[in-house]
């Protein structure tokens, strides 16, 4: 195994001359001594400062009264990351019901979760003010609707203010309430009014929408509290509820809150901390709402902790950024936040084709919450609605949100809401569909056993017409495919069974080109296209052709995995991905522009897995380059391990029979690597990849001295620096 480490000279943070850590024991406190624990925390901080993109001052809004960026906050406070070695690794979502047997247990658990959230996630919020004063500033009629503008005054010397607008329909009350937080969603409130709700808008929202954020002044009003921007918006919602509780028109049993995108995040925070809110419809809040931090990491190509705290450092408490790349160490996740809403009504909803959305992530949250709602005797109070389309909503979406609220508020007794799954996989469902049980003896061909029984298929090229017309469907228009560029061109390539790939080429092609087959990670909502333009341009600039397509269950094929095991119960999703990749090799090799002796498989995360398993069966790839792609399945500790294949992503369900006893697993990655043989291979294994047991991985790789192993001092990220390792390695194969 040829190794290279990238420790480098890390940024030295000369920030810590005088440090006071206000957090609990997990965060640690620094007293200037250089003991081992302090060194660990300092090294963790140096790593963050060295590898993460520096945060940016918010375009609107503030972190607090002093800091514009996360780095400024860290320097001023001197806070350090927690002692990660003392925190348990929880690669799967936290089980919020662990140890909960009674209602009293659940009350204690909720208090524990809220304490965790106030420290790590949103900051400490002030208690409810007891001196609310109401000033009606205007009343008018819009048609038959009474519109009342109100200013709430509260807090020290009544210096806190919050403006509301109340839309009251001409209906005898008391009425259910539809609460939202900025005038851009006024049509949502208007739709609710048409459906018999009292509409309420409170003006605590991002000023980017053109309206003042009343909650920004809470920073100076409550200087002893460090609640973040989204928490300030959510706290403002509770002040609106304070007022609503004084109105005879309001039915206190039925107060719903909703919001879209960043406003969905604050709606969840509001409801998690205020149990007077009895229903929540957070629309496409995604990361920081229902898409859990453990499933928004770089391999999922959505919005990671690094990304969201870089662009929006004020949304959450700055301590959250400490967990970038170490999401498994978070003592909570968004399912914990959402569990605080139970047993009240909650609809999880997003588009499964929007950049930051994820059918997989939302479904995992939904499934994690179902036992909570069942424990609390309200299994019907949680819903899942995944829609197609871009991030913005339509009028029909809002009507469907109100349909859910009508059901929740007993206004539609004859209606029920059926969860809409897109991925829809569970290991238990697969067992029932396949009828399989643990193998009584080890299979002779371990790799084919794991991949399952591939059905007989017509090989490519078949005796079809010369010009085969294929389409990836309407979603490729949403993704802007093929990717547009002035430095490369593209042509469609049919392959396999009615599938379409895009072949990217230099604008001027001279001779036969080496081919890179680009295999994407777990990018459920966008497939191969998000963030692919820059590396494709670099590869074509260096003289490569690049073939890219969506794996089954991702991007334009996101809907194709749901019924896969009903159709092919003895096969596997990874087996299908391998078959499609082999078909893509065949199709590309038939092109006059491709040098079939120089075909390389390149993959990150899931794509690396597909590359390795494909090469294990197919001798045609000349080389394989993989980034953060696997960990030994028999011996790894503290990772998703077998569960990632069998229970989470449904890639190799048969492995699930060995999840509780991994040492007996019939096949592991040493078998895969041996099957690939002596072909050229690059493995990039970041030192801080939370998905890998680094010590177990390096022990395995010692048995393969011909593999080129690069070990950047980084988390599991597909950064430009990591991509350049691949590009340079590819160039080295041409020398």
Each PLM stretch: what is its role?
Residues 5-27:
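N-terminal export signals
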Residues 158-161, 168-177, 498, 507-515:
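Proline/glycine-enriched tight loop/beta-turn segments at coil->beta junctions
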Residues 179-246, 286-295, 518-584:
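Cap/lid segment of the alpha/beta-hydrolase catalytic domain
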Residues 162-164, 189-192, 210-214, 269-270, ...:
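Short, solvent-exposed loop/turn and secondary-structure capping segments
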